[in-house]
């Protein structure tokens, strides 16, 4: 089905629920679209409809109307080689003769010892085959005359703050996901511009004019596709990746370029002879779930362009409870990371109970040693404030997210909070078990009582009065590491 790409004419959005001959995706219809190629249209209950399209081998598509009115348009704004760009701008302000963005240059490590990893690189350095995340010593082997500056994270945070403050002059609907990237919900300000592309070019130009560094802007109907679009050709570019462009622009890419497709997942996919995003999109999701568990379904949805369109601004994010920690030493083993996650889950659970609240959603954040941030979230089966429930959800998310790289920071956050005494809506699955046995219900009650009791003991006698064996073991490791350092 051919569709006009004039998104200012968009009136109705439909989400495909089931496709018999083609993979599931978002389908966008315009108010002036002529349905001359629709073979059959049948209205069913709850607004669910079924159509057959002659041009697509009469494949059946079941969809539901999602929104009437303006389509959600999301921008992903990403600073090009942020650490190097910000360092270059600061050096030029202080009278430097050379712009390090124009020469082979990197940010990372110690200049004298040449230890550490490459955190950012210039386009010229990239031509020598230098990659972000590789050891600095390797970079110097590839380019002996390489210029290197150490990182200055205080300066990066200041430039990041200035950028976010500027973007908020357009709209407060900004979700910052790392020091150098954010999502913007363009929907509320669409009437001020002739098109999203025009707005993106204006933002990009004004950022350069005001600050002296460049950004890429990706545009789509959800955060996933906007993120993928901004990662296309760099620097200083605007790219679109609307649902009808996925097949042409995204499917030919290697599966390793799909968001959240880590090394271990890619290795499994390649064993299944799935090498492109398009091949992944056309694979039976049940097969992917068999090999990659729930992460397989997530990757299948991403390959088909299905993602979240909700931008979580600071105001929205504040309606949650979370905790994160920067680790004294990069963590390289999953078992060590999960001990940290347990400690964080305990902290979050304690704060929830103190506030008399339960959470319906848990999210996990990972920051790697190269300062790349990734995060993901999941709905709980029922609202909970129990440490163990939060911990198990966090571990599940961690297993989906972690790509094997050394970890510098871990965070656990809960959202969609409700009052602790709010009645619980049990699922059919829960009811089945409670009819046969009271064990699941009793188990949940025990978890709540245990968490509350531990919290009470710590409140009276201090945080270390009750410590899980796994947490104690992790602390002993950290103490040994600190002794070695001094």
Indicate where each model-derived feature is located.
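Gly/Gly-Pro- and Ser/Thr-rich, intrinsically disordered tail segments characteristic of DNA damage-repair
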Residues: 16, 34, 52, 56-301, ...
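Alpha-helix boundary/capping motif
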Residues: 5-9, 21-23, 27, 31
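A glycine-rich phosphate-binding loop feature that marks nucleotide/adenosyl-phosphate handling sites
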Residues: 221-224, 305, 358-369, 407-418, ...
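Short hydrophobic targeting helices and cationic amphipathic motifs
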Residues: 27-29, 33-35, 40-41
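C-terminal hydrophobic structural anchor segments
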Residues: 396-449
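DNA-contacting surface of Y-family translesion DNA polymerases
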Residues: 64-69, 257, 265-407, 422
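Short, positively charged and aromatic/hydrophobic N-terminal segments
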Residues: 7-12, 16, 20, 37, ...
């Amino acid at each position: 089905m051919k569709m006009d790409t004039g998104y200012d004419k968009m009136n109705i959005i439909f989400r495909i629920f089931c496709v018999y001959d083609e993979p599931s995706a978002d389908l966008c219809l315009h108010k002036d679209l002529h349905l001359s190629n629709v073979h059959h249209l049948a209205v069913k209950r709850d607004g669910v409809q079924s159509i057959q399209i002659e041009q697509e081998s009469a494949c059946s598509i079941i969809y539901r109307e999602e929104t009437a009115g303006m389509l959600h348009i999301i921008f992903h704004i990403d600073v090009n080689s942020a650490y190097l760009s910000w360092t270059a701008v600061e050096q030029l302000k202080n009278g430097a003769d050379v712009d390090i963005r124009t020469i082979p240059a990197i940010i990372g490590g110690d200049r004298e010892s040449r230890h550490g990893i490459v955190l950012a690189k210039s386009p010229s350095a990239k031509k020598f085959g230098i990659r972000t995340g590789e050891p600095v010593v390797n970079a110097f082997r590839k380019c002996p005359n390489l210029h290197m500056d150490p990182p200055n994270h205080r300066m990066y945070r200041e430039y990041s703050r200035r950028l976010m403050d500027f973007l908020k002059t357009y709209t407060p609907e900004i979700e910052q996901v790392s020091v150098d990237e954010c999502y913007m919900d363009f929907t509320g300000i669409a009437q001020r511009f002739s098109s999203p592309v025009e707005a993106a070019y204006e933002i990009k130009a004004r950022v350069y004019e005001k600050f002296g560094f460049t950004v890429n802007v990706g545009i789509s109907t959800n955060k996933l596709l906007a993120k993928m679009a901004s990662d296309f050709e760099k620097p200083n570019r605007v790219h679109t990746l609307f649902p009808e462009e996925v097949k042409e622009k995204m499917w030919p890419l290697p599966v390793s370029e799909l968001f959240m497709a880590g090394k271990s997942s890619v290795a499994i996919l390649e064993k299944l002879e799935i090498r492109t995003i398009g091949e992944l999109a056309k694979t039976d999701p049940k097969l992917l779930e068999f090999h990659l568990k729930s992460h397989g379904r997530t990757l299948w949805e991403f390959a088909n362009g299905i993602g979240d369109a909700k931008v979580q601004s600071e105001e929205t994010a504040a309606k949650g409870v979370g905790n994160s920690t920067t680790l004294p030493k990069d963590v390289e083993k999953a078992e060590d990371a999960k001990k940290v996650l347990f400690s964080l889950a305990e902290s979050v659970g304690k704060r929830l109970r103190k506030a008399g609240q339960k959470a319906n959603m848990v999210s996990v954040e990972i920051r790697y040693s190269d300062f790349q941030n990734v995060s993901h979230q999941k709905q709980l089966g029922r609202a909970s404030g129990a440490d163990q429930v939060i911990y198990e959800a966090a571990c599940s998310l961690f297993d989906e997210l972690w790509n094997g790289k050394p970890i510098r920071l871990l965070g656990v956050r809960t959202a969609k909070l409700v009052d602790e005494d709010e009645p619980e809506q049990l699922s059919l699955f829960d009811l089945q078990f409670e009819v046969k046995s009271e064990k699941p219900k009793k188990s949940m009650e025990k978890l709540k009582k245990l968490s509350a009791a531990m919290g009470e003991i710590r409140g009276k006698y201090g945080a270390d009065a009750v410590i899980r064996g796994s947490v104690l073991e992790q602390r002993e490791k950290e103490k040994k590491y600190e002794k070695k350092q001094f």
